[in-house]
Amino acid sequence: MARTKQTARKSTGVKAPRKQLATKAARKSAPVSGGVKKPHKFRPGTVALREIRKYQKTTDLLIRKLPFQRLVRDIAMEMKNDIRFQSQAILALQEAAEAYLVGLFEDTNLCAIHARRVTIMTKDMQLARRIRGERF
């Protein structure tokens, strides 16, 4: 049965209490087995769609700042030992890296949809990078 939207109604007064059936009364008085309420389970994909909408609304950075900063410094150490970064430079690198990754995942998703799939695979990412003209 389809769900319908319920609207508020005016109450016309107090109704007389009804007599409960014996089975309902027995059910209410019986103790709940275990006493632990099971957590609510959402259908597969519901939480994923909610997360997609949430992250599409926000403009903040998705990668944590300190781990990204450590990664940048680690990569820079391989090129030169004593290199310093302004905080704005690391933020600019992070913005650029996240913009690149978001675009790559969008193209990867289009490749998966083109192959009549909804799940992205490594071959989709390889195809997206190849079409873009990037090296492996």
From Swiss-Prot:
Q: Which UniProt keywords apply?
A: Chromosome, DNA-binding, Nucleosome core, Nucleus
Q: Give the molecular function GO annotations.
A: DNA binding; protein heterodimerization activity; structural constituent of chromatin
PTM (free text): Acetylated. Acetylation occurs almost exclusively in the MAC.
Q: Which GO terms describe its cellular component?
A: nucleosome; nucleus
- Asked if Membrane is a keyword of the record, the answer is no
Annotated region Disordered: the residues are 1-41
Q: Gene3D superfamilies, per this entry?
A: Histone, subunit A
Cite the CDD domains for this sequence. HFD_H3
**UniProt cross-references to InterPro entries, sorted A to Z:** Histone-fold, Histone_H2A/H2B/H3, Histone_H3/CENP-A
Q: Where would you find this protein in the cell?
A: Nucleus; Chromosome
Record bears the keyword Magnesium:
no
Question: Which Pfam families does the entry link to?
Answer: Histone
Q: What does this protein do?
A: Macronuclear replacement variant which replaces conventional H3 in a subset of nucleosomes. Nucleosomes wrap and compact DNA into chromatin, limiting DNA accessibility to the cellular machineries which require DNA as a template. Histones thereby play a central role in transcription regulation, DNA repair, DNA replication and chromosomal stability. DNA accessibility is regulated via a complex set of post-translational modifications of histones, also called histone code, and nucleosome remodeling. Functions redundantly to H3.4.
Q: Which protein family is it in?
A: Belongs to the histone H3 family.
Q: How does it assemble?
A: The nucleosome is a histone octamer containing two molecules each of H2A, H2B, H3 and H4 assembled in one H3-H4 heterotetramer and two H2A-H2B heterodimers. The octamer wraps approximately 147 bp of DNA.
Q: What is this protein called?
A: Histone H3.3
Q: Which organism is it from?
A: Tetrahymena pyriformis
